[in-house]
Amino acid sequence: IREELGVNSYTAPSIQLLFKELNALKPIPFEKVWRDLPDSTPQDRARLALSIGAVIADGFLTVTAEKQSGIEPIGRVLLRLAKGLGVGDHVTKHSRSIIEKAARKEWGDIRKELIRSQAEVEAALLGLKDEEMAHLVALGGWLRGLEITTSIVHESYTPARASRLIQPELMNYFLDRVSTLNPKFKKTKLGTALEKNLREIKRITTKPVNTAVEPDEVTRVRELVREINALVSGGEE
């Protein structure tokens, strides 16, 4: 069904790829890259899908940093958002398992539950023939992941660390997906910022081989992705 609806291998793995990036960027200044989890449920499906992906990315950050106190809130918020999108039944068991495993500090198992949560949400959306929302879950995770990684690199810059921000395949993939989004959504403040800022991020991070992203460019990418994520969590239409 994934092939049939045009969802290729980047959709499901995209958020869990953040684990590789975070492990490469350790030690993680957790308090400086953490954010308050969303305390409300967006009313529109696009922001809901993006929010689910972002919270899964927050979960990966918390697992990588082994912050036990942060796991239970993530499990509860993830379930609330999934219910808002109409796929709560597919996440309930994973949310419960995440909370139970956090009490035992079973980090590897929590990671697996987060990965399964995205897969279940994606499968449910594809079952509803809602390919667009499945892509937005993946995009939401990637955007939050980019905010986290640019913040870590900004905190302790080296050219090698900054080189991890160059992801041309993912950039092209998500820009292609954004170009096909519902025209009504693309006219919203979030939709406009999403396309405009992603194109600017691509411009900044498109580099010749062995050319680093400079410190001021890291700062600019962080600003651009933060603007998008603030619109996702802040509710501005």
Regions found by a protein language model. Give the residues of each.
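N-terminal Sec/ER secretory leader and immediately downstream segment
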Residues: I1-I98
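Exposed alpha-helical structural elements
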Residues: L17, P29, G70, V77, ...
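Generic structural concept
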Residues: G53-I56, G75, L79, I115-Q118, ...
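Secondary-structure edge/capping motif, primarily at the C-terminal ends of alpha-helices
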Residues: G59-E66, L85, D89, A124-L128, ...
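Short, charged, amphipathic alpha-helical segments
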Residues: E72-R76, R96-S97, L136-L139, R161-P168, ...
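Extended amphipathic alpha-helical interaction segments
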Residues: K101-K187
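A cross-kingdom marker for long, charged
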Residues: N182-E237
